[in-house]
């Protein structure tokens, strides 16, 4: 039977790369998408579930049968400063609760460098780092097997990745740096094979 891993935020810049990297190692990604999201051509053949993540029943159905979930959702910059609260805290919490209900026991969460920091310029966007930390805490307390990835300075660069060095540290060890989104995606796939 094929391995299936759900990816929420699969149409985003990091999310679609996570799905592509899953395909590269023979895992079938189940793309969890907003109704209006576009999917890159490389993922058109993948299973797609369009839903509002606030709909608990739809979320449970979307996750049922998956062996794991990679959460790559994130609030987009907007004049609506409640986005980070709705997406990065409550939306993450809702996905975790759904995993508990349908027995998806492994979760990888893409968060952000400096999550939880109050005095940081990114917090001008709806206290995003504070809300991301609340989402992380929900996962930490869930009883599920989990990994939180906190990348910073995400770049779109796709060349020279084989010459990159990824520095893995514990929480709050790095203040700044940059990493290509493709390498974050690979870290997510690697994390699926590593129990917390």
Where does each model-flagged region fall?
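N-terminal Rossmann NAD(P)H-binding glycine-rich loop of SDR-like oxidoreductase domains
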Residues: 2-27
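Residues at the starts of beta-strands that form the adenosine-phosphate
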Residues: 4, 28-30, 105-106, 145
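NAD(P)H-binding glycine-rich loop region in Rossmannoid oxidoreductase-like domains
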Residues: 5, 31, 37-101, 116
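Residues forming the Rossmann-fold NAD(P)(H) cofactor-binding site
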Residues: 16, 89, 186
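Glycine-/Pro-rich loop/turn segments that contact NAD(P) or position catalytic residues
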Residues: 75-169
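Substrate-positioning beta->alpha
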Residues: 92, 175-190
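Short, glycine/charged-rich beta-strand-loop motifs at protein surfaces that mediate ligand recognition
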Residues: 152, 170-179
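Core catalytic loop region at the nicotinamide-binding pocket of NAD(P)H-dependent oxidoreductases
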Residues: 191-196
């Amino acid at each position: 039977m094929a391995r299936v891993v759900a990816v929420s935020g699969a149409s985003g810049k990091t999310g679609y790369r996570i799905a592509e990297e899953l395909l590269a190692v023979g895992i079938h990604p189940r793309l969890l998408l907003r109704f209006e999201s576009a999917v890159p051509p490389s993922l058109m053949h993948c299973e797609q579930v369009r839903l509002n993540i606030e709909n608990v029943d739809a979320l449970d159905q979307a996750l049922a049968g998956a062996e794991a979930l990679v959460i790559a959702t994130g609030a987009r910059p907007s004049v609506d400063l409640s986005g980070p609260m709705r997406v990065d805290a409550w939306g993450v919490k809702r996905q975790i609760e759904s995993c508990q209900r349908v027995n998806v026991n492994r979760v990888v969460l893409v968060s952000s460098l400096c999550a939880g920091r109050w005095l940081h310029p990114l917090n001008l966007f709806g206290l995003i780092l504070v809300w991301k930390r609340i989402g992380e805490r929900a996962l930490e307390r869930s009883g599920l097997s989990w990994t939180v990835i906190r990348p910073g300075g995400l770049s779109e660069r796709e060349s020279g990745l084989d010459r990159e060095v990824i520095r893995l540290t514990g929480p709050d060890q790095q203040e700044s740096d940059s990493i290509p989104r493709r390498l974050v995606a690979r870290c997510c796939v690697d994390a699926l094979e590593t129990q917390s």
